[in-house]
Amino acid sequence: MAHQFPALTSEQKKALSETARRIVANGKGILAADESVGTMGNRLQRIKVENTEENRRQFRELLFTVDSSVSQSIGGVILFHETLYQKDGQGKLFRDILKEKGIVVGIKLDQGVAPLAGTNKETTVQGLDGLSERCAQYKKDGADFGKWRAVLKIDNQCPSHLAIQENANTLARYASICQQNGLVPIVEPEVIPDGSHDMEHCQYVTEKVLAAVYKALNDHHVYLEGTLLKPNMVTAGHACTKKYTPEQVAMATVTALHRTVPAAVPGICFLSGGMSEEDATLNLNAINLCPLPKPWKLSFSYGRALQASALAAWGGKAENKKTTQEAFMKRALANSQAAKGQYVHMGSSGSASTQSLFTASYTY
């Protein structure tokens, strides 16, 4: 017999629910700026800029110091540990700059993946040890939500039952610990787009993964109204020769969500998964126009798909500040419109925005 021992007080629930709803209110989404030092190095290398702490700080300062109107498009920003404690040129903490704009500050909490022995190179997530203490410290230091990314792949015998169950339980344990410490957990079970599988196969796997995740969240007494989901869109594998329209992606994606994600979840913020900036926006717009019941806000939590044009415009040069910030604002506004189903594609948007951002076996 299941006995109920309250996991959260009504005050804790109210605070978590309000924060989650605030992040995705009125077409707002999330800027994922939580790339690790190594991942940021790969980005900077492409524009021939050295991967130093100062260069990483300078680029992120450009993103965070844009006009305050960005808060109409961006409801939350996910930071990496380093960035939470960095300051702008005037000595002001980035987290304070964001909060003054009304943007909720989040923090990456997972510590990468580790191999699952006995599987076909599948992984689980590290970072549960000491997580409660880290959450408490981050909350004290201004963070109000967390992010934890689990990775599942479609391949021969993958994802295995073990990988699905292990990652679902780890996500649920993380979510529970977050909520105990006053952080809204972003639950990210990513079915990565590596492979040649078709969209229908991805839909089948995504449904199995999400069903397991919500069973685990229920088992761990996670308060769904105080969470957000960050899933992949349902797309074909990157090497699949068959191409699908945004409308087909939208129908498959919303169908999968409709079958697996409880209506209590306030928002679903899609990851961009290496899509070009423009494709990520077009797919999100089609998802919001999909003629199926959609009880949740359907928004974005994009990293590369919000930053690629801005990074290309910057090129490591301080004099490119204006064009860099304009490029970022343009993508933020486009995705906010898409989150309301109001984006209008205006033909070519420039080479950076239509370039695929796919990286095989992508790690943050």
Swiss-Prot record:
Name of the gene: ALDOB
Organism: Bos taurus (Bovine)
Coiled coil stretches, renumbered: none
Chief location bin: cytoplasm
Example GO molecular function: fructose-1-phosphate aldolase activity
UniProt subunit comment: Homotetramer. Interacts with BBS1, BBS2, BBS4 and BBS7. Forms a ternary complex with G6PD and TP53; this interaction is direct.
In-chain residues carrying the UniProt-annotated modification N6-succinyllysine: 13, 121, 317
Pathways involved: Carbohydrate degradation; glycolysis; D-glyceraldehyde 3-phosphate and glycerone phosphate from D-glucose: step 4/4; Carbohydrate biosynthesis; gluconeogenesis; Carbohydrate metabolism; fructose metabolism
Annotated positions of the N-acetylalanine modification: 2
Gene3D superfamilies membership: Aldolase class I
Keywords, ordered alphabetically: Acetylation, Cytoplasm, Cytoskeleton, Glycolysis, Lyase, Phosphoprotein, Schiff base
Gene Ontology CC, one term: cytosol
EC code: 4.1.2.13
Residue numbers carrying Phosphoserine: 36, 132, 272, 276, 299, 301, 309
Disulphide-bonded residues: none
Positions annotated to bind beta-D-fructose 1,6-bisphosphate: 43, 272-274, 304
Catalytic activity: beta-D-fructose 1,6-bisphosphate = D-glyceraldehyde 3-phosphate + dihydroxyacetone phosphate; beta-D-fructose 1-phosphate = D-glyceraldehyde + dihydroxyacetone phosphate
Phosphothreonine found at: 39, 119
PANTHER family (alphabetical): FRUCTOSE-BISPHOSPHATE ALDOLASE (PTHR11627)
Gene Ontology biological process: fructose 1,6-bisphosphate metabolic process; fructose metabolic process; gluconeogenesis; glycolytic process
Keyword Cytoplasm in annotation: yes
Protein name: Fructose-bisphosphate aldolase B
Cellular localisation: Cytoplasm, Cytosol; Cytoplasm, Cytoskeleton, Microtubule organizing center, Centrosome, Centriolar satellite
